[in-house]
Amino acid sequence: KSRSRGLGDVYKRQERYWGTPLPVWRSESGEMKCIGSIKELQDEVAKAVAAGFANPECPDDVDLHRPVVDGFTLLSDSGEPMTREPFVMDCWFDSGCAPFAQWHHPFDEEQRFNASFPVDYICEGVDQTRGWFYTLLAVSATVFDDMAYKRCLSLGLILDAEGKKMSKSRGNIVDPWDHFNREGADATRWYMVTAGAPWNPMKFDPNGVRETYAKMFLTMWNVYKFHADYAALDGFDPEAQSVPVKDRSALDRWVLSRLHTVASQYHDNFTNWQFHKACRDLEDFIVNDVSNWYVRRSRRRLWDEADSHDKLSCQHTLHEVLETVCKLVAPVSPFMVDHIHRNLTGTSVHTADWPLGVPGGLEGATADDWDDVAAKATAVLPPQDLVLERTMALVRELAEAGRRIRIDAGRRQRLPCAQGWIVAGPDLSEFHDLLAEELNVEAIEVETDLDRFQRLELAPNFRALAPKARADVNKVAGAIREAADPEALLASIRDGGADVLGVLVEATDVEVKRVEREGFAAQTVETEGDEQQHQVSLVLDMNDTPSLLSKGMARDIVRRVQAKRKDLDLAIEATIDLEIWMEHAPEMMAGDREWVATETRAAACVFHESGAQPAADSERFEVDGT
């Protein structure tokens, strides 16, 4: 309302040659006529000719622009000649008439006009608030007593990375073609959508485009290449008999459920014009759910050279996820996903069905629906399992807790632990093997009592203790800290007080802590259940054995060799010859040596003990200073 009060008159005329001529003729005495159609102009020209005024012909296809219309002389009601006003309409007035002028309404196309007016959506820069947005509304309200559009998106201005207006004089202009040629139009478009709400001013940061390219599009391409490479090796045919969703692994069912959840939210956010939120959520799904979790946890399933139910399940799941992701990304970044979709299905993603259609709709498909049409350009989403999603979220939280435990304890990630325990929380037995591999522990067990891994520790509360102990406060504090049996001391304190070096120590004089016993480390996470939050603790056994040290060394060697294979751009199925010289390193057990050879696809694998001279072209690395 305040904006409309501040608006001045719209300039309806301009002293220009090009444009829509004002259809107004004026006599010298001030009489005016406004002509509303070609038929009306023809009639007025005929009257003027009959009155003796010379006029050119006025056919049905007469050119209504200058200089043609300026050649017509009309007749006033008092018999005077009338000439056209020498002005053209303001171009914004033309734009305001676009909804009906495009159909030549009211003379033609009434049905098409009625079907398209008011329009569903218009979009322009914020500077059009006083321009096109206003003239559309003003003309529509005046002529039709109605709005011209149902929804209007006013885009914020694009500024430089520091929030300053771009200008040649400042030298802060960004040439979009620099980014199109370097990172590609896909990454540029995705960055501009995800950088912020579209109605806010945007600080365009070239580094953001590069980060988007690396994080989003390289990740998506790598996921596709991972699937395509193994699919080619195995001769995978997506049209062949699939594995029913209900018979797939929990990991497969989880990522399909997440796909359902993310796709539904993506659709809803687009419908509500929250484009930035939609694309951020989808990017998080691609990077964290698909690449960093599903693909990473599924690599070994595809390494098996023999055909298996589990491998086929993984291949179909990856294919279905990629196909649907391509459809979701396409409206914003259309190029790379079209290439991927053509390779997956043989058809363009831009002719595929939107994945939230019928049957199934936003509620998704039943498991049977999904199995029947998943290999075809389906219009349904896979079945959703929110309980499974919450459970997997807890599993991932515990995996992250395990990484934090190792960092805090200074224990490298590839050195396995003998055992891990999950204390409290829901049943995760279905994921114990997955979690054990992710945490790099030999076994996962369930424990109900966290006290098994903790001990009591008493600390003095100096603020309460000092007035009692006075000069002996430090001695009393030391005695409390170094108590031989802190649990017995705490029991005495809580039972009326305990005498410590002649000072009565009460409950307010101490602070009670529980810390991990020697050889254990723990972290506690909170997770939401159906109606309440759960506290779940993860405990790791931090003690080392020769067997664990051997396995840890084997894992570090494999990582180095795999990185070298990648540097050499070796094919997945390529075999190598491997020699390893070990100096001041833990003894490698026979089983771990065989594992190294298998994991690295080494046809020959030789281990040299300390004292052997490494080859001149060998690569040296240290593990924990060794």
Where are these predicted regions, by residue range?
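Structured mid-domain segments that build the active-site/substrate or prosthetic-cofactor binding neighborhood
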Residues: 194
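Feature 926 captures the class I aminoacyl-tRNA synthetase adenylation module centered on the KMSKS loop
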Residues: 9-93, 97, 143-185, 209-626
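Aromatic-residue-lined binding/catalytic grooves and analogous aromatic/hydrophobic interfacial grooves
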Residues: 106
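Non-catalytic, structured segments within soluble enzyme domains
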Residues: 190-191
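A short glycine/serine-rich beta->alpha loop
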Residues: 116-127
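Short, solvent-exposed helix-loop connector elements
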Residues: 200-209
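Single conserved hydrophobic/aromatic residue that forms the stacking wall/gate
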Residues: 1-8
